[in-house]
């Protein structure tokens, strides 16, 4: 086989393996509060970060906001700090700056701050109510 064809085959194989590895490995459900407002949050953990959604209980499940984030400190740190951006219909709505240590063997609960688009900051306290391996589904 010619070296050029071999390189292309290896590149495609590497891309396919990388794509498969990047699939969500674990899903989490949280219930708690942002300030005084009850919320339900779902997150899926990837190698490159997390995605999910959140809804305010008073608004109902049909009014979900999209979440996408990444850890912002060194993985060797015993406490992982996450920056999670919240959007609604593709528009920025706010940012979570929280501690969540599920991926380093720590607490699965989320605590920290949420700052909305107007600059108002709220305490975040979320308890993990469900953890599911998405690889097994």
PLM regions: where:
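Central antiparallel beta-sheet cores of small beta-barrel/beta-sandwich binding domains
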Residues: 25-137
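Bacterial Sec-dependent N-terminal signal peptides
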Residues: 1-27
């Amino acid at each position: 086989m010619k070296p050029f064809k071999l390189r292309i085959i290896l590149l495609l194989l590497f891309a396919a393996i990388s794509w498969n590895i990047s699939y969500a490995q674990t899903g989490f459900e949280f219930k708690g509060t942002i300030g005084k407002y009850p919320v339900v949050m779902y997150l899926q953990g990837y190698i490159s970060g997390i995605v999910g959604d959140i809804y305010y209980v008073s608004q109902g499940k049909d009014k979900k906001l999209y979440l996408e984030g990444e850890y912002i400190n060194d993985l060797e740190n015993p406490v992982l700090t996450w920056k999670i951006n919240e959007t609604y219909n593709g528009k920025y709505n706010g940012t979570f700056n929280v501690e969540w240590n599920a991926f380093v063997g720590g607490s699965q609960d989320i605590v920290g701050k949420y700052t909305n688009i107007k600059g108002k900051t709220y305490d975040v306290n979320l308890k993990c109510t469900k953890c599911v391996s998405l690889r097994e589904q």
